[in-house]
Amino acid sequence: MDTALKRSRSEEPVELPPPAREAEEKEEEEERMEQGLEEEEEVDPRIQGELEKLNQSTDDINRRETELEDARQKFRSVLVEATVKLDELAKKIGKAVEDSKPYWEARRVARQAQLEAQKATQDFQRATEVLRAAKETISLAEQRLLEDDKRQFDSAWQEMLNHATQRVMEAEQTKTRSELVHKETAARYNAAMGRMRQLEKKLKRAINKSKPYFELKAKYYVQLEQLKKTVDDLQAKLALAKGEYKAALKSLERISDEIHERRRSNAMGPRGCGVGAEGSITSVENLPASKPEPDAISVASEAFEDDNCGNLVSEDDSETQSVSSFSSGPTSPSEMPDQFPAVARPGSLDLPSPVSLSEFGMMFPILGPRSECSGASSPECEVERGDRAEGAENKMSDKANNNRVLSSTSAGGGRSRSQSSTSLEGQALETRMKQLSLQCSKGREGIIADIKTVQIG
């Protein structure tokens, strides 16, 4: 029983702690994402071509380096062999090698002069043949022109003769130059041969004794020259293979940069709005339709102006109605003459601090219409309205003073400029309200005087 329990416990999967499990799940998710990206993205066909070039260049470089190393090793081995054998032979021959060196040097110079003279002779012969062929062409052209009975000398014939003449002149110049070079080389060759014969007669015994040494030296010299030429060719081929390898690497690097840039742009996605611009996006088309919301001060000032003007209009209407009841004049207010001065509309109110609409209502109580008073045309009603206006003016001045005190207290002792500006604004507001109340009282006095005049009349 115990063994069965142990076996069942051992077969149960071991639960990992939460951090280890999360890390393992994260790694598995990253691996799946990488595999998915690799499967989704197709391999750029340019990569395959550049990789083939890179592999081919690598093989060429390895092969050329091996061949170059073998050629250099062979050159060094031949050089060592020639040095050892020539030293042994020089020791065997003795002093005759040093004595016969001038002769062999003169012989080498004569051989070089002979080769130059042969080359100059070939150039001279070639120039002579070209000159002869050009002269024959001109003679044949002239002969055909003379044999023709019509003798039509057209532009094509003239152009052919011009080319033939030009070739003759060039051939003559080439022949002259080659002739001069041939003479110079022939002179050097004759001088070298004369010196060689002179030394041969003088050093005949030493020359015969050291001849095996210099013949072996010439043999190794020719062999070393051939090996040196092979090494130079292999070095040029190796440099070419390295250039191809470098070009393939640059191409692969450029393709890799393009792929990484494309992946980065795809991962970033389209560019969105800046920080803080998510909730306040307003299109250009909706700009004309959007209107700024009025603040509390502007709403209060507009309400105050509308109520004052409404009160003035209602008072004018009531007075007009009372006048029309006592007189037989015009029955509509529009037919009455303009006897009352126009009341100036107050401008926008500039308060020293933000004031809500309810506070503004407390500061400036709005008078009700004149019709609400019991005695519309009685002097008691006029006195009551005057008391209301005076009370409203007193409350307004008290409220403005309180606002000035509050604003000056909140500003602190270090803001003298803000306090002075606040007090000036409060004084300007008080002066403006006094002017408005005076204008309203003047309008009422004029209306009362007109009513009394009508009643007396």
Swiss-Prot record:
<dbReference type="GO" id="GO:0004860">
    <property type="term" value="F:protein kinase inhibitor activity"/>
</dbReference>
<feature type="compositionally biased region" description="Low complexity">
    <location>
        <begin position="406"/>
        <end position="427"/>
    </location>
</feature>
<feature type="compositionally biased region" description="Basic and acidic residues">
    <location>
        <begin position="1"/>
        <end position="12"/>
    </location>
</feature>
<dbReference type="GO" id="GO:0005739">
    <property type="term" value="C:mitochondrion"/>
</dbReference>
<keyword id="KW-0344">Guanine-nucleotide releasing factor</keyword>
<keyword id="KW-0175">Coiled coil</keyword>
<feature type="coiled-coil region">
    <location>
        <begin position="46"/>
        <end position="92"/>
    </location>
</feature>
<comment type="function">
    <text>Functions as a guanine nucleotide exchange factor (GEF) with specificity for RAB11A and RAB25. Inhibits the auto- and transphosphorylation activity of BTK. Plays a negative regulatory role in BTK-related cytoplasmic signaling in B-cells. May be involved in BCR-induced apoptotic cell death.</text>
</comment>
<keyword id="KW-0472">Membrane</keyword>
<dbReference type="GO" id="GO:0007254">
    <property type="term" value="P:JNK cascade"/>
</dbReference>
<feature type="modified residue" description="Phosphoserine">
    <location>
        <position position="378"/>
    </location>
</feature>
<feature type="coiled-coil region">
    <location>
        <begin position="99"/>
        <end position="147"/>
    </location>
</feature>
<feature type="coiled-coil region">
    <location>
        <begin position="156"/>
        <end position="202"/>
    </location>
</feature>
<dbReference type="GO" id="GO:0030659">
    <property type="term" value="C:cytoplasmic vesicle membrane"/>
</dbReference>
<feature type="region of interest" description="Disordered">
    <location>
        <begin position="1"/>
        <end position="68"/>
    </location>
</feature>
<dbReference type="GO" id="GO:0005737">
    <property type="term" value="C:cytoplasm"/>
</dbReference>
<feature type="compositionally biased region" description="Acidic residues">
    <location>
        <begin position="25"/>
        <end position="43"/>
    </location>
</feature>
<feature type="modified residue" description="Phosphoserine; by MAPK12">
    <location>
        <position position="423"/>
    </location>
</feature>
<feature type="modified residue" description="Phosphoserine">
    <location>
        <position position="420"/>
    </location>
</feature>
<feature type="compositionally biased region" description="Acidic residues">
    <location>
        <begin position="308"/>
        <end position="319"/>
    </location>
</feature>
<feature type="modified residue" description="Phosphoserine">
    <location>
        <position position="377"/>
    </location>
</feature>
<feature type="compositionally biased region" description="Basic and acidic residues">
    <location>
        <begin position="382"/>
        <end position="398"/>
    </location>
</feature>
<protein>
    <recommendedName>
        <fullName>SH3 domain-binding protein 5</fullName>
    </recommendedName>
</protein>
<feature type="coiled-coil region">
    <location>
        <begin position="213"/>
        <end position="257"/>
    </location>
</feature>
<keyword id="KW-0496">Mitochondrion</keyword>
<feature type="compositionally biased region" description="Low complexity">
    <location>
        <begin position="322"/>
        <end position="334"/>
    </location>
</feature>
<dbReference type="Pfam" id="PF05276">
    <property type="entry name" value="SH3BP5"/>
</dbReference>
<dbReference type="GO" id="GO:0017124">
    <property type="term" value="F:SH3 domain binding"/>
</dbReference>
<keyword id="KW-0968">Cytoplasmic vesicle</keyword>
<keyword id="KW-0597">Phosphoprotein</keyword>
<keyword id="KW-0729">SH3-binding</keyword>
<dbReference type="GO" id="GO:0035556">
    <property type="term" value="P:intracellular signal transduction"/>
</dbReference>
<feature type="region of interest" description="Disordered">
    <location>
        <begin position="371"/>
        <end position="427"/>
    </location>
</feature>
<feature type="region of interest" description="Sufficient for interaction with RAB11A and for guanine nucleotide exchange activity">
    <location>
        <begin position="33"/>
        <end position="267"/>
    </location>
</feature>
<feature type="modified residue" description="Phosphoserine; by MAPK12 and MAPK9">
    <location>
        <position position="353"/>
    </location>
</feature>
<feature type="compositionally biased region" description="Basic and acidic residues">
    <location>
        <begin position="44"/>
        <end position="53"/>
    </location>
</feature>
<feature type="region of interest" description="Disordered">
    <location>
        <begin position="308"/>
        <end position="347"/>
    </location>
</feature>
<dbReference type="InterPro" id="IPR007940">
    <property type="entry name" value="SH3BP5"/>
</dbReference>
<comment type="subunit">
    <text>Interacts with BTK. Interacts with all isoforms of MAPK8, MAPK9, MAPK10 and MAPK12. Interacts with GDP-bound and nucleotide-free forms of RAB11A.</text>
</comment>
<comment type="similarity">
    <text>Belongs to the SH3BP5 family.</text>
</comment>
<dbReference type="GO" id="GO:0005085">
    <property type="term" value="F:guanyl-nucleotide exchange factor activity"/>
</dbReference>
